């Protein structure tokens, strides 16, 4: 670990105290380690446009882990995950939940595999594939989408991934009311949650959708 570990640990702990999240010291250590790995790899592989570690803690870690308390399924697929967002922070928060992390770029998948190795995460499976081409060998019961596509596109591209009892979780900024109104036939919104992220301006919404 680099010499900013103590600084980042303190900063993340302060952010977490402003929420009702229950996060162990080991989990904080893993989350900080993840940020340090993004920062290190970003210099070569351009994994994210966020360049400073302080912003990464907010925009990548806090913005992801506030979702944890709203997930109840056993196996999620995070589509268009990039470097593992929100899937890896959520996997750290929910060690009993399995996450398939799907991205089409090999450099991102290689990074996520290294994260799994270094942080000893056995509940993530990074996969390189386009979402419309992917067929899971496992039973999936939840789809996660963060800044990935419109609701219509997400549902059209991902509906083959889960069964009729599965849940689609779309993470959005401003509430996309027009997208909700234009949902394709056969789908229904069951819950809309306004997420609170300390120190982060702008709206954050979680939208749960099921097959109807």
From Swiss-Prot:
It is an enzyme of class 2 (transferase). Its main location: cytoplasm. Keywords: Cytoplasm, Methyltransferase, rRNA processing, S-adenosyl-L-methionine, Transferase. It is found in: Cytoplasm. The keyword rRNA processing applies. It catalyses: guanosine(527) in 16S rRNA + S-adenosyl-L-methionine = N(7)-methylguanosine(527) in 16S rRNA + S-adenosyl-L-homocysteine. InterPro entries: rRNA_ssu_MeTfrase_G, SAM-dependent_MTases_sf. It holds the Pfam family GidB. GO terms for molecular function: rRNA (guanine-N7-)-methyltransferase activity. GO terms for cellular component: cytosol. S-adenosyl-L-methionine binds at residues 80, 85, 131-132, 146. Belongs to the methyltransferase superfamily. RNA methyltransferase RsmG family. NCBIfam families: rsmG_gidB. HAMAP family: 16SrRNA_methyltr_G. This is Ribosomal RNA small subunit methyltransferase G. It comes from Pseudoalteromonas atlantica (strain T6c / ATCC BAA-1087). The gene is rsmG.
């Amino acid at each position: 670990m680099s010499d900013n570990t103590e600084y980042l640990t303190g900063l993340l702990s302060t952010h977490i105290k402003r929420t009702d999240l229950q996060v162990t010291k080991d989990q904080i250590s893993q989350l900080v380690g993840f940020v340090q790995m993004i920062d290190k790899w970003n210099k070569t592989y351009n994994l994210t446009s966020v360049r400073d570690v302080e912003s990464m803690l907010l925009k990548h870690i806090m913005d992801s882990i506030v979702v944890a308390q709203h997930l109840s399924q056993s196996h999620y697929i995070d589509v268009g995950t990039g470097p593992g967002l929100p899937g890896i922070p959520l996997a750290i928060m929910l060690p009993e939940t399995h996450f398939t992390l799907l991205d089409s770029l090999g450099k991102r998948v290689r990074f996520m595999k290294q994260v799994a190795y270094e942080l000893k995460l056995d509940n993530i499976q990074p996969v390189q594939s386009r979402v419309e081409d992917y067929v899971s060998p496992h039973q999936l019961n939840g789809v996660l989408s963060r800044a990935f596509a419109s609701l219509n596109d997400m549902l059209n591209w991902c509906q083959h991934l889960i069964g009729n009892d599965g849940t689609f979780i779309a993470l959005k900024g401003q509430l996309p009311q027009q997208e909700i109104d234009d949902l394709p036939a056969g789908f229904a919104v069951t819950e809309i949650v306004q997420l609170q992220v300390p120190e982060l301006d702008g709206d954050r919404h979680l939208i749960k959708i099921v097959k109807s």
